Regions:
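A generic alpha-helix surface/boundary motif
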Residues: 76, 134-135, 150, 228, ...
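Short, solvent-exposed loop/turn elements at domain surfaces
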Residues: 80, 103, 115, 179-180
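Short linear capping/connector segments at secondary-structure termini
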Residues: 59, 63, 95, 108-110, ...
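Short active-site loop at a secondary-structure junction
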Residues: 84-91, 112-170, 214-225, 296-299, ...
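N-terminal export and membrane-targeting signals
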Residues: 1-19
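Short, surface-exposed loop or secondary-structure junction motifs
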Residues: 110, 164-366
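Catalytic loop of the DD-peptidase/beta-lactamase superfamily, centered on the K-T-G motif
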Residues: 2-5, 23-102, 238-240, 244-248, ...
């Protein structure tokens, strides 16, 4: 089964009986030997971010302030993971109203020329795209164009069991449909020509040839197939291409000028180079210019630190930076109603997870990982951006960084999506 993001075949158990499907994983020592990664100190950067109404601190919280000593501990934690896992570059932003701000860029953005990581770089954000696609769906529900309990067969033909699978179940990862990105033929097609373009219908074909994993609604099982279908629903009900709908109805109202839904492999600059071992040979390659069409509504989008800081709170609250609603309160409550997963402390709602109070999503696709979450109880926001998706010790690095940072900054609310070891 798939991870909590848009990866290819590597999987984790978020249901009790799930088994991992392995890809060759390059050891950390191999990365360092091949690419010569050295520990690089952080650059402290001030990032201009628009004021977010309602961001005053709560009256009390168990979290420490982000003073010099705490920042030194955070620096050490990030550097430690980078050294252990041979991470080329990472940018971290942590905003805690009334307690301080921590923004750091570590390491390098480009192995070829040694350019440093920086907070203003564009990055591919993988499955964080799901938060935008599901927000579009919820907007259309608010406008009476769709109903969450409609069957997917009302909008998309040819879906196995489409008369029984609802839009709500798709958004909540409870459809039972096979994850197309775990199909062997899809993996070969992508890695043999990673710059090729896929259509949503081509991708769905890789899923629909497999039997359903369970009856709709039975449990949470992460599948990128669900989001492809919801993307098609948004296009049909919204009357325009998915990227255009998201741009006009979400990005522009939220002021997210550095976030986009690319229609091809185009990547605005400046951006970090991304490194992956999700390749045909298992060797590390530069995946920066791989075509993200294979992930489409599940993971094709691009953003930066500034925009993701704003988006984190928007997703968690359902309101725009100026305080006006992006979706109705009723649908926001439904979005945040989570179902438990096999990972302790983690639940999944409609296109978002809640991990010990942190609400948001992570993302991963070849070359990049990200984490964008908001903690309403402390009005805190955490964004982590990496230019590699190579796991270490069977764990995604965005989770490793998120856990290490929140153990220090918000010890009462530790973010962890650590995967249980699985056989196979």
């Amino acid at each position: 089964m798939a991870r909590w993001c848009g990866r290819l075949r590597r999987g984790v158990a978020i249901a009790a009986a799930a088994a991992a499907i392995g890809l060759p994983v390059a050891a950390g020592a191999v990365w360092g030997a091949v690419h010569g990664v050295a520990e690089v100190g952080p650059a402290t950067v001030d990032v201009a971010v628009p004021h977010i109404p309602g961001s005053a601190p709560p009256s009390a919280d168990e979290a420490p302030g982000l003073g010099p000593e705490v920042k030194r501990r955070l620096d050490a934690a990030v550097r430690g993971i980078m050294k252990e896992a041979r991470v080329p570059g990472v940018t971290v932003g942590l905003w805690m109203p009334g307690k301080g701000t921590y923004v750091r860029a570590f390491g390098i953005a480009d192995q070829h020329n040694g350019l440093p990581m920086a907070p203003d770089l564009y990055m591919r954000i993988g499955s964080e795209t799901k938060t935008f696609t599901v927000t579009a769906l919820l907007q259309l529900a608010d406008r009476g164009r769709v109903a969450l309990d409609d069957p997917i067969g009302k909008y998309v033909d040819g879906v196995p069991g489409g008369s029984r699978i609802t839009l709500r179940q798709l958004a909540g990862m409870r459809s039972g449909l096979f994850n197309y990105s775990e199909d062997e033929a899809f993996f070969r097609a992508l890695t043999s020509d990673p710059r090729r373009s896929f259509t949503p219908r081509q991708l769905l074909g890789y899923s629909f040839k497999h039997p359903a994993l369970f009856p709709p609604g039975q449990k949470v099982d992460y599948s990128n197939t669900n989001l492809l279908l919801l993307g098609l629903v948004v296009e049909k009900a919204g009357g325009r291409p998915l990227g255009d709908y998201i741009r006009d109805n979400i990005l522009r109202p939220a002021g997210l000028g550095h976030t986009l839904f690319p229609s091809d492999a185009a990547f605005p600059g400046p951006h970090a180079q991304g490194y992956t071992n999700q390749t045909a040979s298992g060797e590390i390659e530069n995946a920066t210019d791989w075509n993200p069409s294979w992930a489409w509504a599940a993971g094709a989008m691009i953003s930066d630190l500034r925009d993701l800081r704003v988006w984190a709170r928007t997703v968690a609250t359902g309101t725009l930076p100026d305080g006006t609603p992006l979706i109705s309160r009723a649908l926001q409550r439904q979005r945040l109603t989570v179902r438990p997963t096999a990972i302790p402390g983690a639940g999944y709602g409609l296109g978002v997870f809640d991990v010990n109070g942190w609400i948001g999503h992570n993302g991963s696709l070849p070359g990049y990982e990200s984490l964008t979450v908001h903690l309403p109880s402390a009005r805190a926001t955490l964004v982590v951006l990496l230019n590699t998706d190579i796991d270490h010790g069977g764990q995604e690095l965005s989770t490793r960084f998120g856990e290490a940072i929140t153990k220090i900054a918000t010890p009462g609310h530790v973010f962890s999506l650590r995967v249980r070891p699985t056989a196979g």
